[in-house]
Amino acid sequence: MPSELGDVTAVTTDLQSPGPWTAALAGASAVVHLAGESVAARRWDARQKQRLRDSRVEATRTLVEAIATLEPGSRPRALVSASGADYYPFAPDAKDSEFDDDEVTESAAPGDSFLARLCRDWEAEAQAAERLGVRVVCMRTGIVLGPGGALAKMTTPFQLFVGGRIGSGRQWVPWIHRDDAVRAYVAAITDERYTGPINLATTSVRNAELAQALGKALGRPSWLPVPGFALRAALGELADYALHGRRVVPMRLREIGFSWTYPSLDEALAHSRA
């Protein structure tokens, strides 16, 4: 974390109920809230969906309630919360020749999928802190390219020479390099121009383009597509989020004047495997 932030306290805890962690809030200049169980940790059932919801919506409610117990002068000035680009509706079916080329900015309405409702409710709990005089930022994040995480799962088929596009390959995928994501979070802590929802992405590319670029970065072919039916058989409902997408664009970051270190997909992938 850059030295200009001063003292940084990292807290790893269960946010389902108040506890000793609340002491770290008093006098903090900002809170960066990244809690949430991995969406792709396991196949979804009713219990897993509840875990995903509790680890985001309920945890954020508990956090804001803890902030409310502080004296106004001791409250954080900013709450920077994670959110997801899945906030937006699915694009039309991939058979549509255009597959929804319309750019999606932060002003777009939420969707009605499970993750869209989850992100909507998650953000609503964070935005409740505004009533306490706290500036709230919700980072609607796409795929983050960096060591581990989503990229590690994406590269495995390519390493085995069986990588390729998913489904039609026409679905849009918003992406950002991990270093740029961190820089945006750091800026949001102190820069008051960051407020409300922020599309945390560099741009969006077609899934087929992402697969081709990933194969190039790994020195592997990208010739074997993954059929939609096979993905649905393996992942169930979660597959819909890989087979559909929206052309999410970072309108607010552009307006603020954010500068990306890795503006091109090829460059971002080349610096994502260290």
Please give the residue ranges for each predicted region.
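Alpha-helical substrate-binding/gating segment
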Residues: Q127, T155-G164, R170-V205, A274
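Glycine-rich "substrate-gating" loop/helix at the edge of Rossmann-like oxidoreductase active sites
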Residues: P110-L115, R140-G148, S168-I176, I189
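NAD(P)H-binding glycine-rich loop region in Rossmannoid oxidoreductase-like domains
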Residues: P2-A59
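Mid/C-terminal beta-alpha module of Rossmann-like enzyme folds, strongest
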Residues: D191-E237, A270-A274
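Catalytic helix-loop patch of NAD(P)-dependent Rossmann-fold dehydrogenases
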Residues: D54, E58, D93-C138
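Conserved Rossmann-fold NAD(P)-dependent oxidoreductase catalytic core, especially the SDR/UDP-sugar
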Residues: K49-R51, R61-S113
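Glycine/proline-rich active-site loop of Rossmann-fold NAD(P)-dependent oxidoreductases
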Residues: R120, L132-V134, L145-K153, A188-I198
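C-terminal amphipathic/interface module of NAD(P)-dependent oxidoreductases
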Residues: D240-A274
